[in-house]
Amino acid sequence: MATHILFETATGFNIFQLSGMESIAEFTDQVQKSMQDFSKFSKVCKMVGSLPFTSAENALENINSISEGILTESLHDFLKQTFSKKTEGVVLGVCDNKLSASIGDELKISCLSNSHTSEIIRCIRNHISEFTKLKSADLLKAQLGLGHSYSRSKVKFNVHKVDNMIIQSICLLEQLDKDLNTFFMRLREWYSWHFPELLKIIESQVHFAKLAKLIQNKKNLTEESLDEIKEILEDNESLAKDVLSAAKASMGGDISQIDLVTVMHFADRVISLDEYRTNLTQYLAKKMQDIAPNLSALVGDRIGAKLISRAGSLTSLAKYPASTVQILGAEKALFRAMKVRGKTPKYGIIFNASAVSSETKNKGRIARCLSNKISIATRIDCFSDNPTAKFGVALKQQVADRIKFFNNGVAPKRNLDVMKEVIEEVEKDFAEEEVKPVVKESSSKKRKESEPTEEKSSKKSKKEEKSSKKSKSDDVEMKEEPVKEEKKSSKKSSSKKEEEPVKEEKKSSSKKEDKKEKKESKKDEKEEKKSSKKDKKEKK
């Protein structure tokens, strides 16, 4: 019986403590009704700890780990802190079995995950807004945001990498081939009752159906329809004339109008199905170029699509070893041989590849080499960010070189050297693709810059004209100004010359006066000294 419950929400982790488990364990109708009342349920279940998520990224990281049964560091520390005092007697109820096992292994806490625990968690979920004191609208927003980000991380895929379209297309194409073959045979037998010679002249099934639709009743066929017959037979005039002559001398019986209409309806349906098959073939080729260009270049669109369909997906095919790819499609023969202890098959679907089917000798060795190259090509297609068919072309050339080696003994290039050359070519191509848009942008910028420069030049020319007019008027003014300045300067110079001698005269007169004053002061001092000496003598 669980004593505590670990509950995860979009906002964080919560731990609840349970009490009175005897009544809850019964889960009668009365107990279930009381569980719906929060006041009663809160007496039995109390929240003892909570760990809110710090951000949306933190919430997504924790939820991703919990969904895989991994114990995160934050949850580890939270549980350790909550049950730090006592772990004995604690039984933690956890919703996920894997998570409960990882908690028990790391923290040595006994965990429980059963129907009783899930019922209690359901009741907690019903009252979580009251426990956390959060509004139900806020909880719903958090759940929506986390749910969208979680699903986005799980359902992350590239639209061009949808190999399911290839699987469905090749299955439908194979079925169409079988059905169309049956329908063409039925049309031949049906229309041959009326015109049996046409079956011997025309070998192509599509041409036979189109001619049957054109001719209808052989009695109405004339030479006027020769051009139309030539158009159907791709401008083969001799065959067209043979059809005309055979219609005139035909041994077939007459056919009623009702029977002829029925045959023509069936011919229309067969022709439309053949057109749909050609469109589907083109669609498959385009999809193979988008999803597995190297595999398509190595073995062709249809064989590559068959391999992907047999493996289940491109990723599954990329994970297969070369030995499994070699016998893919020959599982029945393989298990039959293993049961009887006979020889195992050397090839499966890849037998239809031109490299294997065209050779009479060394088919097993060529199939082994081709399966090795297929496994390399599928891994490049599956895990490369920039799809390119150059690796597939190089691998196909390696298979051709290996066939030459088996037949003539000419040593092929090393795989390492070939791959280095291809990688250099691919890097050059991507560098050129990155440079092209930059060149376009710079040219557009130059064009934009050139347009305003032309406007600026026109504006400048207008300004220069105005400035030239102004400069002429300024020159006239400048010529007049120096004359005025010369007159002013002459007046100033004459006044200065007159002022200078006056200043010199004043200076000389002031010097003379100073000398006279000094002489007088010296005389006065001498007289005072003499008078002072006389006074001293008289006192004595």
Curated annotation (Swiss-Prot):
Ranges of compositional bias, category Basic and acidic residues: 434-488, 495-530
SUPFAM superfamilies named in the record: Nop domain (SSF89124)
Keywords, comma-separated and alphabetical: Nucleus, Ribosome biogenesis
Lineage: superkingdom: Eukaryota
GO cellular component: box C/D methylation guide snoRNP complex; nucleolus; small-subunit processome; sno(s)RNA-containing ribonucleoprotein complex
Disulfide bonds: none
Chain segments carrying region Disordered: 434-540
Signal sequence bounds: none
GO biological process: ribosomal small subunit biogenesis; rRNA processing
UniProt function note: Probably involved in the early to middle stages of 60S ribosomal subunit biogenesis. As a component of box C/D small nucleolar ribonucleoprotein (snoRNP) complexes could function in methylation of ribosomal RNAs (rRNAs).
Name of the protein this chain belongs to: Nucleolar protein 56
Organism of derivation: Dictyostelium discoideum (Social amoeba)
